[in-house]
């Protein structure tokens, strides 16, 4: 991954070709729509933050074959909820089959990667330490 920008608050690098779209910042109860993010990412793939709060980040992650998943371990715990598609999520060597409706927890610092997908859309929920 080469860096063209950094994700807010985490020091994570944004791959070249990805763009930051302003996310909704919530400090009180709020609702948010992920439809626009899903539509923007459907063809090209990528990650877009849709909600930020002091303790949480929510994003939409779309993987389109043959582009590989370039993730590196993160400093925060995260949960993936598969919205569309199927594949394999490998966490620290353990392979988990994922499909629409599957959720998976990845602890901070864990090596993890999606493989075996054609088109995979995932809701990503990061804690902020």
Predicted segments with their positions:
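A generic "binding-loop/recognition-motif" signal
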Residues: 66, 75, 94, 110, ...
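Short, conserved beta-strand element in jelly-roll/cupin
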Residues: 63-64, 74-89
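A cytosolic small-molecule/anion-sensing beta-strand core signal
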Residues: 83-84, 99-100, 118
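A short, N-terminal "cap"/entry segment at the start of jelly-roll beta-barrel domains
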Residues: 1-60, 70
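Ligand-binding loop in jelly-roll beta-barrel domains
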Residues: 108-129
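Structural motif
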Residues: 53, 91-93
């Amino acid at each position: 991954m080469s860096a063209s920008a950094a994700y807010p608050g985490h020091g994570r690098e944004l791959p070249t070709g990805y763009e930051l779209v302003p996310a909704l910042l919530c400090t009180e109860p709020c609702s948010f729509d992920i439809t626009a993010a899903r539509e923007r990412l459907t063809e090209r793939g990528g990650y877009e933050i849709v909600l930020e709060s002091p303790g949480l980040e929510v994003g939409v992650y779309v993987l389109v074959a043959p582009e590989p998943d370039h993730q590196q371990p993160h400093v925060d715990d995260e949960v993936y909820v598969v919205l569309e598609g199927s594949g394999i999520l490998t966490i620290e060597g353990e392979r988990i089959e994922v499909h629409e409706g599957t959720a998976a927890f990845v602890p901070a610092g864990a090596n993890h990667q999606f493989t075996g997908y054609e088109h995979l859309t995932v809701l990503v929920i990061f804690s902020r330490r």
